[in-house]
Amino acid sequence: MIISSQLARMSLAGVCLGLSLAANARSQPEQASADIRRTSFGVPHIRAENERGLGFGIGYAYAQDNLCLLANEIATVNGQRSRFFGPDQFTVEERENRVSDLFFTWLNTPQAVDAFWQAQTPEVRQLMEGYVAGYNRFLGERRVQGLPQQCQGDWVRDITAMDLVKLTRRLLVEGGVGQFAEALAGATPPAAVAGSGGKQAAFRVADVRMQRFALDRGSNAVAVGSERSFNGRGMLLANPHFPWVGGMRFYQMHLTIPGKLDVMGAALPGLPMINIGFNQHLAWTHTVDSSKHFTLYRLQLDPKDPTRYLLDGKSLPMHKQTLTVDLKQPDGSVKSVSHVVYSSQFGPIVQWPGKLDWDNQYAYSLRDANLDNDRVLQQWYAMNRAGSLKEFQASVHEIQGIPWVNTLAADDQGQTLYMNLSVVPNVSREKLAQCSDPRIGLQMIVLDGSNSACAWDIDPQAAQKGIYAADKLPQLLRKDFVQHSNDSAWLANPAQPLTGFSPLISQDSQPLGLRARFALDRLGKLAKSGPIAAADLQHMVMDDQVYQAAQVMPDLLQFCAADLGADAQALAPLCASLKAWDGKANLDSGVGFVHFQNVMEPLEQLPDIWRVAFDPLDPQHTPRGLAIERAPVAQALRQAMLASAEQVKASGLRKDTRWGDVQVVSSGGEQTPIHGGPGTLGVYNAIQSVPRTDGKREVVSGTSYLQVVTFDEKGPQAKGLLALSLSSDPASKYARDQTLAFSQKQLSVLPFTEQQIKSDPDYQAQTIREQDTKLAVQ
């Protein structure tokens, strides 16, 4: 009995110890592990048993390829650039560090960041926590080896989940208040002295940046359904045009949790899920939409105090928020400075000299709908996991987390889907008419801030207060095709126009962009030649056709053939190069393409240059033709040609210069020629490049992640590439390899199945575990 009692006590103690250990284990984060298998071009295929493990693998792999990039962006979204790099240096977006820091200190307050974090699902939190652990794990390993040259400094540190929240919040406001950083940082009452944010040069750059937003973050998309595809199943062309550098640089990867998730595509920095991609049953992409995601409010100020405003006749004080930013001094010391941001109940006061002035009568407040969007990560993860197009569409309806893009998709059953279901302020056409000045136009929506009736309407069916519910937004489900190239929702498919929406959502009967006209023209021609194949979608991008050339080249050549008088000799080389040009933006296209760009850019700024004006009844073919018979048009054309001739000569370009000699990208320590050109000229393969001092042009954005996905009885069959390559580290072997493939127009199979992955000639596998000090490499 004594022995039995002792055994019983020992057993009970063992049970208690076991329960204690189990409880302690539950209170601790589960130790994560992941397999990282890399295939050609270093594309990581990350597999784990749960979200934390998957995030761990994503963060580790991303750090292997872009350690310094993410560290730099973390410093940015924490408002610490001035502290580490100095207040007068500039971000990659050409924004002064001091202004950037003030903006992100305002945007990412501890309260806002914590509220976003608390709103996340357990799965999303686990992904983010795993990502942090994976990134920090690789950072620790790399510190032992020595950090890359481009990120030597105390600004490189372990990250936290809150850092990823801040990155996400920056992404959310890219289509809204993020474009007003200078205006927010520079807003001061009329009696005060304007600070650094009021510099005119900074606002000129900001104005250009705002105008370029849709160009630098544009996109093309085509989804083909069973009625038009070669095999009766769905097909998708995804061609997002995004920056090649900085915090909006896509990263390619494949994510798997057996039995739960299997998705491949591309994601933006710091995001532990796919933004654009495909899974077993469907493929999807996004295009930047034309919807409005913020409104301005013109405040009527209290005559006694410009920091008070009148609402329904009552004087209300503006809220004052004091921000503190650390500035690195020339001697290396750090000085803290304070700045006050003013806000009304609608949002922060923004001051843009000559546009949005803060005087003694009026001030302007900005309300961004995406500041309250804490659903974006849940949204993309639900889309990643969708097992059907119906489930995919339902997730967007229910969550409403898409910030400022359209969504196009195709599935293995031959259905196609277009959704303009982003976060849009609920301002009806009627309210807009009552609450805005029609003379201002619709480029920026300015509502009456003195009348509470002009507040955004509330729909109980919407996911957040003040936005449109999903069933009030444009969407189209078809079996022939849907397409989009950053225009409104109107002609996603001309056979079924989408009309009658608030101007904040979509405007119809407006001129189409030239990329959309090209797409509809090409799809129309393909319809006459038979079913559409994957190669047809690839050629839409890789043909590098300059669609506008077909609209105006006969007129340009006719002008050249006329008597040019005293300018004949000066314009002879230009006219000869235009005549010899092939009408494309290929590497071997002649210098005529340079002249064409130089001539058309100033002409397009003028009114009434077209022989056939825009006709809303024929939007696919109008406007067209240069009205060279009109003296003002002929004079403007002559001046543009003379200017181009002089510019090309000064740049050192010769008659035998090719486009590939001009447009290049510097990566991996080398320069790579890049085909493609301005989307404003109708180049579907839209590439944005900026002039350099040596006469060349450096690529900054454009075709980034490119995928063409079809389906058969086995699942998705995909080809694609990441034009900017996987790694931003110039020392990496993955810094330039896909860029060369893009230059040569060589898309590769995207390995999705286990057989495809393991049979890849460059296959390598790595297993990582949180507790390991050594990694298993096979």
Predicted regions mapped to residue ranges:
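A terminal-accessory region detector
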Residues: Y418, V427-A433, D567-Q663, G669
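Substrate-recognition/specificity elements adjacent to catalytic centers across diverse enzyme folds
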Residues: Q28-G247, L255-K260, M264-M273, F278, ...
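Bacterial N-terminal signal peptides that target proteins for export
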Residues: M1-S11
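Second-shell loop/turn segments in exported
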Residues: G57-I58, L102-F103, P110-Q126, S365-R367, ...
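N-terminal signal peptide c-region/cleavage motif recognized by signal peptidases
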Residues: S20-A23
